[in-house]
Regions:
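Short glycine-rich, low-complexity segments
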Residues: 1-25, 39, 43-118, 139-179
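Short beta-strand-centered aromatic/proline hotspots
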Residues: 26-32, 120-127
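Short, solvent-exposed coil/turn segments at beta-strand boundaries
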Residues: 31-36, 57-58, 128-131
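Short aromatic-glycine-enriched beta-strand elements
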Residues: 37-40, 132-136
């Protein structure tokens, strides 16, 4: 799969990526890859930008290109005037660059751990301590929900700026402003 990802990155084609969770897939453009993780700019089914995802390549089971779905999505994104994102500048690997961007930008993240197929953590990255990551968690209503610590190596995927994260983040800001 690493060679396939590298080829798609060079071709800059819109693609659909399937992982161990057979119920879902993501569609968009690959922005970067380091052989372990790939960075993908996502679009929702209506052609709107849906954030960035850093995905462990080993979790990818299938990649599709040139499908009717992908062609329609590309048309819709153009129709909606969606502009392409630049890749995140990095010194080290893709995951570290993504985490640094999340920390610096105070971005609400959704994290899947150990290919669980679930949103295991939703929150703000507050600290990077070697291999350990500290997140201030929020629930789906934008309310604080404690803190969690886990190792970066447990991350299957992490994303930010999707519609879901933007909604939860907005609720958090609106509720925090009331206090």
């Amino acid at each position: 799969m690493k060679e396939c990802i590298a080829k798609l990155l060079r071709e800059d084609k819109l693609c659909s990526v399937f992982t161990n969770d057979a119920e879902k897939f993501m569609a968009g453009y690959l922005l970067d890859s380091d052989g372990e993780y790939m960075l993908m700019e996502l679009f929702n089914p209506y052609g709107y930008s849906d954030g960035l995802c850093c995905q462990r390549i080993e979790s990818v089971t299938k990649v599709e290109t040139d499908t009717l779905y992908n062609e329609d999505l590309e048309l819709l994104a153009g129709y909606r005037g969606q502009t392409r994102r630049q890749k995140i500048e990095r010194q080290g690997n893709v995951l570290d660059a993504f985490l640094t961007e999340a920390l610096r930008g105070k971005k609400l993240c959704t994290v899947e751990l150990y290919d669980s197929g679930c949103d295991d953590v939703i929150g703000f990255l507050t600290e990077i301590d070697g291999e350990e990551l500290v997140f201030a968690m929020l629930n789906e209503h934008g309310n604080p929900d404690g803190e969690t610590v886990f190792e970066r190596g447990s991350i299957s995927s992490i994303k930010f700026e999707s519609e879901d994260e933007e909604k939860i983040s907005a609720l958090f800001r609106l509720k925090s402003a009331k206090e």
